[in-house]
Amino acid sequence: MSKKGLKVGIASAAVIGAGAAVLQAKNKSEAKKAAEKTTVTSEPKNDYRNTERGKDKKNSKGIYYTNGNYEAFARPEKPEGVDEKSAYLVGSGLAALAAACFLVRDGQMKGDHIHILEAMDIAGGACDGIYDPTRGYIMRGGREMENHFECLWDLFHSIPSIETPGVSVLDEYYWLNKKDPNYSLCRATKNRGEDAHTDGKFNLSQKGCMEIMKLFMTRDEDLYDKTIEDVFDDEVFNSTFWLYWRTMFAFEDWHSALEMKLYFQRFIHHIGGLPDFSALKFTKYNQYESLILPMKKYLEDAGVDFQFNTEVTNVIFEINDGKKVAKAIECKVNGVEKGIVLTENDLVFVTNGSCTEGTIYGDQNHAPNGDAEVRTSGCWTLWKNIARQDPSFGHPEKFCSDIAKTNWESATITTLDEKIIPYITNICKRDPRTGKVVTGGIVSCMDSKWLMSWTINRQGQFKTQGKDKVCVWVYGLFTDVPGDFIKKPMKDCTGKEVTEEWQYHHGVRTEQVEDRVERSGVGVSIMVVYI
C-alpha cells in the first residue's frame, strides 16, 4: 500500500472510530434521558394539584391582586378595629381625596378620624381650574380619560353629583360622553393654520415599528437611566406617530425610556384612537369643578377633617429589622411649626413628588419668572427628608435636580370678542360656543418652534364663564427656543405674548396680531418646573 493509501486508511479508521465514539456517547445520553424520564413519570405527584386556592392570599403589604368586577361591586365587611384607627393624608390632590373616599366607603372609617393636611388654601392639587380676579381664568393642565380608568370609575359611581340630584358623577359623565362623543377633526396644522392632513396615519417605517416593539419587550431594569433618544432614532422621531405621542403626553427626546415604555403598556389598547382622540372622554367643566368639588363635598358630608395651610415637612420613621413605622409628622400650620405623634393605629398616606409643585404664575403683562430651585418646593422637600432616612424610600433627586430639562409651560387664554372665533372654527370645523365638543383634544402646530399645542374643551369650562367667552388651553414643549412671531423663548413671555404667538399660528395677519390680542384676549402664562 502506498503512503497516500496508508494515510487515507488511517484517516478513515480515525473517522470511523470517532463516529463510533460519538454514536456510543449519544446512545448513553439517550439511555440516561429515557431513564430520567421513566423516573420522573413514575413518581406520583401527590404534592401537586390544579387549584386557585390561595390566589387571594395577602402579600407582605397586606394586599392581594384581583381582576374582573366581582369584588368591585361587593360591599366589604367592616374591618376589625377600624373604629380605633385614624388616617393622615398629606396633600389634597386626586390621589389623597380618592384614598379618603375609599377609607369612608370601603374602609368604613369614621370621617372625623380622617385628616387631610394641605399646604395650600384650596383642595385639588393638579386638578385645578379657578377664576382669579387679578389674572383671569386659569387651568394648568387637564386629564385625558378613557374607559379603562377602572379605579376612577369605581370611585365616581359612588360620589353624588353636585348638579343633578339622585345621580352620581359617573352617571353625568357617562351620559354626556354618550350624547356628545369626543373626536378631533384636525389633529395638526402647518403654515399658520392649514390642516396638516395627518389623516390618522402613523407613517412609521418597519424599522421604526421594530424599535418601538423592542422597547415594549425590554425589561424595566435594563431601561434604568436610559433616555428615549437612547432607544429610538430618526425612524421614530421623524414619524407622525411621534408627533401624536410626544404632544399628547408631553415627551421630550431626553425623557425616561422607562416612562415611555410604561405609557405604551398603559395605553396600547387605544393605539387606534391616538390620531383623532376618539378613545378619549372629557368632563363637562374643568376638572376642579367636575371631579374635585363633588369629592370634597362627599368627604365633608362624612365629617372628614380638612386642614388647609398645613405644610408637612417630614415624616419621622422608626426602622428596626427592616420594619418601618411612621412615628411622627412634622408640619407648619400657618407658618408655625407643629408635630403630630403617631401610633401603629394611624395610617399615613403621602403624595410625594407632585409635578405641579413650585408652579410659577404669570399674567397678561408678566412672564412666569422666578427661581424655582430656591423656592420652597413642598412635597419634593418632604420626599427628600423621608428619603434621607432609608435608601428604600427612593431617590427624588432623579426627578427634580435639572429643571432646565423638566420645565414645561402652559397658558390659559380667554377670548374677549368674536374676532378670533372664525380662525378657530376654520381649524377645528366646529363652533366653540355650542357647549359641545370643540377641538376634541389638542391641535398641534407642527412647524411651531415652541411645538405649540392648544385645545378647547366644551364651553363654558367654568360655571361662572360668560357665554360670549371661550377659554383656550395652550402649551409649548420647547420653552427655551425663540418663537416664530415672538422672537424670545416661551418661558420669558407674558400672557399677551403667548396669545400673540398662538394667534399667529392661526393665520391672523401679522400686522393685526398685536392689536387683536390687546383687545380680544387675556392670557395667563404658567411655568410648571417638574414635568
Model regions and ranges:
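Extreme N-terminal leader/targeting segments of oxidoreductases
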Residues: 4-87, 105-111
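Glycine-rich FAD pyrophosphate-binding loop
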Residues: 104-131
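Short, solvent-exposed loop/turn and secondary-structure capping segments
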Residues: 126-129, 259, 359-364
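Rossmann-like flavin
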Residues: 162-266, 281
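C-terminal segments that line or cap access tunnels to active or ligand-binding sites in enzymes
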Residues: 268-283, 345-347, 352-531
